[in-house]
Amino acid sequence: MNGDDAFVRRPRVGSQIPEKMQKAFDDIAKYFSEKEWEKMKASEKIIYVYMKRKYEAMTKLGFKATLPPFMRNKRVADFQGNDFDNDPNRGNQVEHPQMTFGRLQGIFPKITPEKPAEEGNDSKGVPEASGPQNNGKQLRPSGKLNTSEKVNKTSGPKRGKHAWTHRVRERKQLVIYEEISDPQEDDE
């Protein structure tokens, strides 16, 4: 971008501020002393305007939002007549919406299956499919699976493993592979 374009968009020192922005600045100015307000740049003032707008939007939506720090200093009544001295969230530093993440977890149960946690703790559990830890051999449990274990094994979300591992684990008999020789090798 050309640097001249940025200069054109910036308001000049002696230029008029739009009426809407001036009203927003006046709403924010009451929270600062005259010296603080004069020292602030226009960008800082705009940031405070947006902070106040976001706070008002959150409270209108029904969230229990805390006052922004600059609004706590004066504790003046806002334009709607609400007294900030009576705000129960005045001393809190963190915003707490009505539906926190912990409450959402209570409403919506975890999606992760419980079976993997049991396998790690249970020594009789169904062993994993062949892999480097058991030297390529497929292990089977000593007894048959009961119906509840079969249901837990087949139902539920996928665990991110390969699609064929489920089928390999349920085979009843071991498959033995033989080498098929070429007819040319047999002639020798």
From Swiss-Prot:
Pfam families: SSXRD. GO terms for cellular component: nucleus. Residues 144-155 have a biased composition (Polar residues). Disulfide bonds: none annotated. InterPro entries: aKRAB (IPR003655), KRAB (IPR001909), KRAB_dom_sf (IPR036051), SSXRD_motif (IPR019041). Residues 112-122 have a biased composition (Basic and acidic residues). Residues 20-83 form the KRAB-related domain. Residues 78-188 are annotated as: Disordered. Residues 179-188 have a biased composition (Acidic residues). SMART domains: KRAB (SM00349). PROSITE patterns: KRAB_RELATED. SUPFAM superfamilies: KRAB domain (Kruppel-associated box). Residues 156-170 have a biased composition (Basic residues). Keywords: Transcription, Transcription regulation. Belongs to the SSX family. PANTHER family: PROTEIN SSX5, SYNOVIAL SARCOMA, X MEMBER. Could act as a modulator of transcription. This is Protein SSX5. The lineage of its organism: Eukaryota, Metazoa, Chordata, Craniata, Vertebrata. The gene is SSX5.
